[in-house]
Amino acid sequence: MAKLHDYYKDEVVSKLMTEFNYNSVMQVPRVEKITLNMGVGEAIADKKLLDNAAADLTAISGQKPLITKARKSVAGFKIRQGYPIGCKVTLRGERMWEFLERLISIAVPRIRDFRGLSAKSFDGRGNYSMGVREQIIFPEIDYDKVDRVRGLDITITTTANSDEEGRALLAAFDFPFRK
């Protein structure tokens, strides 16, 4: 079992119960899922780029990504409905905890000119979204085999009812928020 999950069960739950005066352990917010999304707009011209992006996402997450297709045609972007334009992975359970551990301890500190993550990226319901400009911050990606530097979106979905609860949950995991 992931160390971060054990840490959550042993220490974070009790800390948040006292901080927010919950009556039940089930009221304590928890991480539900982590979604990784990589939009590959250039895939319209070259389908091979989407395969490379999917391979990168597989290496990062340890799970095969779902190819996302365009919902509607947009003439300005030269895309038609049903064109493959990206890929996404939804992590839950053990893989989610392992990814969160790697994200906090290894990947985020490797971001260039890193001064902390914005605490304003909560959506109002305790879910946190962040963008990563380069996929090479993850140790699973071999720098020499990268054909092009791509970014990805990471969304951490929690059961928190407010941004304050979500922020307290992620801060308890030593999430590096900007002061």
From Swiss-Prot:
The keyword RNA-binding applies. One of its GO terms (cellular component) is ribonucleoprotein complex. Keywords: Ribonucleoprotein, Ribosomal protein, RNA-binding, rRNA-binding, tRNA-binding. The keyword tRNA-binding applies. This is one of the proteins that bind and probably mediate the attachment of the 5S RNA into the large ribosomal subunit, where it forms part of the central protuberance. In the 70S ribosome it contacts protein S13 of the 30S subunit (bridge B1b), connecting the 2 subunits; this bridge is implicated in subunit movement. Contacts the P site tRNA; the 5S rRNA and some of its associated proteins might help stabilize positioning of ribosome-bound tRNAs. Belongs to the universal ribosomal protein uL5 family. One of its GO terms (molecular function) is rRNA binding. Part of the 50S ribosomal subunit; part of the 5S rRNA/L5/L18/L25 subcomplex. Contacts the 5S rRNA and the P site tRNA. Forms a bridge to the 30S subunit in the 70S ribosome. The gene is rplE. This is Large ribosomal subunit protein uL5. GO terms for biological process: translation. InterPro entries: Ribosomal_uL5, Ribosomal_uL5_bac-type, Ribosomal_uL5_C, Ribosomal_uL5_CS, Ribosomal_uL5_dom_sf, Ribosomal_uL5_N.
